[in-house]
């Protein structure tokens, strides 16, 4: 980040998806944090920031749902700021999401009432909120699915994505998963590798994962795997620079096999190793331990 540049992260998303954890994480990263700033005040706040108030260079703003007009004002403010030629601001939206069933579970556990729920039925409020937030989710530069994340894991993910913003301008996140458990909702691109030879049918490899050499060597040795890797590398080499040029701060690439244990893990690790010298590349393996957990 340039010394004169001011980074502003707008934190929003579904109620119960982890915004409170997120803002505490940004505070620990040294961001100047404000909770529930009305969008109508955003331009005035930015004016103070650009005037050099307290020499603030990193800001995180939490903006919750207050109705459609609330976000109309937010979009208008962001568009006006982005159209200012001399602006030294870097504004991005971080959207926190989770599956409806997980949000319902969290509301039941905390015994809180959803702000849009009538009669205390959280699912009704969640569905209304999801519809209202559809546009802002579409404009978000970063989306984090917190369905399977504990608070500490969400904190670690935010730290991983934002701690290095002063040194890295573009991150590539390769996430392996199993199609039987659903597609990651925060993935920008999804690739299906279920056509590759499956180590699950090799008795010695079945209990192992793609993090182990025996499995990765098996997956990568096949002609079809080598051809696929070559073609996908060509695609990534073409697409990633364009994503970066368009101002996207991160691309999440989902690679899925049946259970998320062997093939997808192998290829996520392969591509991460291939691109880590060029980009801020990292991996996560969403479903790598689910088969073991389900067999207990």
UniProtKB/Swiss-Prot annotation:
This is Nucleotide-binding protein ABC3036. Displays ATPase and GTPase activities. It comes from Shouchella clausii (strain KSM-K16) (Alkalihalobacillus clausii). Belongs to the RapZ-like family. The lineage of its organism: Bacteria, Bacillati, Bacillota, Bacilli, Bacillales. GTP binds at residues 64-67. Keywords: ATP-binding, GTP-binding, Nucleotide-binding. GO terms for molecular function: ATP binding; GTP binding. It comes from the Bacteria. Pfam families: PapZ_C, RapZ-like_N. PANTHER family: RNASE ADAPTER PROTEIN RAPZ. The keyword ATP-binding applies. The keyword Nucleotide-binding applies. ATP binds at residues 13-20.
